[in-house]
Amino acid sequence: MSNENRTCSFCGKSKSHVKHLIEGENAFICDECVSNCIEILHEDGNDGTPSESAGGEPEESGKLPTPAEIVANLNDHVIGQEQAKKALAVSVYNHYKRLRHPKAGANVELSKSNILLIGPTGSGKTLLAQSLARKLDVPFVMADATTLTEAGYVGEDVEQIITKLLGKCDFDVEKAQRGIVYIDEIDKISRKGDNPSITRDVSGEGVQQALLKLIEGTVASVPPQGGRKHPNQEFINVDTTNILFICGGAFAGLEKVIRQRTEKGGIGFGASVHSKDENADITKLFGIVEPEDLIKFGLIPELIGRLPVIATLEELDEDALINILTEPKNALVKQYQALFGMENVELEFEEGALRSIARQAMERKTGARGLRSIVERCLLDTMYRLPDLQGLKKVVVGKAVIEEGREPELVFES
């Protein structure tokens, strides 16, 4: 093809009608079409550069999700806990904004916004942390504080948390250094009493001190591929300075510490008068928690200082538990309906059954965590027989199934 007859493969314009005509293999593109392509990519929030794969800095080549967008995503998975969601969203947004603009705070030292979640068992602490990491597309790992020990003791030392985090991103150090670590049951490693221990304990203050080093930022030496440490071995160095740590716990008994502080009262103008009702709302008390309360509970002051954002979660009531059963994308009722649907059987939960399930979970003090075991128990026999029940059209779970252990109603094709 002569130069004069060459045309853009996209718009059909000839070389004489455009400034530039770029030649490829058996194709041409003009400068105008290139400009249009760039505009389209910008409108899609992509500047044309390849984005980082899963587990890197959140949406590196695109827009960092705003706090409102993060909360909207959390609403799809977690019912209620609006204040906790806002606190988490703002802290996480500020954290990754700080990482994206390291030079912006050249004259100001921007601290890391590590988070402490306080709330009863089954209120959604773990699910919130998991959902956050999923939305931000960063490596995420969970650790149980009760299984951790100081280095040198039998058990899982705190540096193994970083080993697990590396494993989540195929030992990509850069990705791991921007990940999220959730440490559950942090309240279970509180030291006994207000005064520091004379001797270090394996599972209490000593573990807090070890965690403190990770949280405030240190270079952890991790064995390659997660193996055990041994002499003459090369280690992977991971800087934990920019890893976001979220700690959670039920803090049973903390309300007594807060009540003791607030009920001291006084005489004169400005003195607070507080009720000594033992049935005072624990959620409201958690909402006014102060660092001094956490110190009295048994957390060391240095650790509390590294967890500047404190978010409290409410105990879930009956209506909230019913919503958890039916509303989120991963709602239990929807999950079981999908399983039954695979056998071409409709599954229905009556309102009375849902309320009974929620009531039993509240009585067990297990919150949302206890819902699955209750539903599983009432459907176990039916699911066992389901593949062999020819002509079954519908299964109805009523109140009596939950409260009296009766079989669900089976509706067959007529």
From Swiss-Prot:
Family annotation (SMART domains): AAA, ClpB_D2-small, zf-C4_ClpX
Positions of ATP binding: P120, T121, G122, S123, G124, K125, T126, L127
GO molecular function, one term: ATP binding
InterPro entries: AAA+_ATPase, ATP-dep_Clp_protease_ClpX, ATPase_AAA_core, Clp_ATPase_C, Clp_protease_ATP-bd_su_ClpX, ClpX_bact, P-loop_NTPase, Znf_CppX_C4
Chain positions covered by the region annotation Disordered: 44-65
SUPFAM superfamilies noted in UniProt: Glucocorticoid receptor-like (DNA-binding domain) (SSF57716), P-loop containing nucleoside triphosphate hydrolases (SSF52540)
GO annotations of cellular component type: HslUV protease complex
Pfam family, one: zf-C4_ClpX
Annotated keywords: ATP-binding, Chaperone, Metal-binding, Nucleotide-binding, Zinc
Stored NCBIfam families: clpX, PRK05342.1
UniProt similarity note: Belongs to the ClpX chaperone family.
Function as written in the Swiss-Prot or TrEMBL entry: ATP-dependent specificity component of the Clp protease. It directs the protease to specific substrates. Can perform chaperone functions in the absence of ClpP.
Complex formation: Component of the ClpX-ClpP complex. Forms a hexameric ring that, in the presence of ATP, binds to fourteen ClpP subunits assembled into a disk-like structure with a central cavity, resembling the structure of eukaryotic proteasomes.
This protein's name: ATP-dependent Clp protease ATP-binding subunit ClpX
Organism: Neisseria meningitidis serogroup C (strain 053442)
Higher taxonomy: Bacteria, Pseudomonadati, Pseudomonadota, Betaproteobacteria, Neisseriales
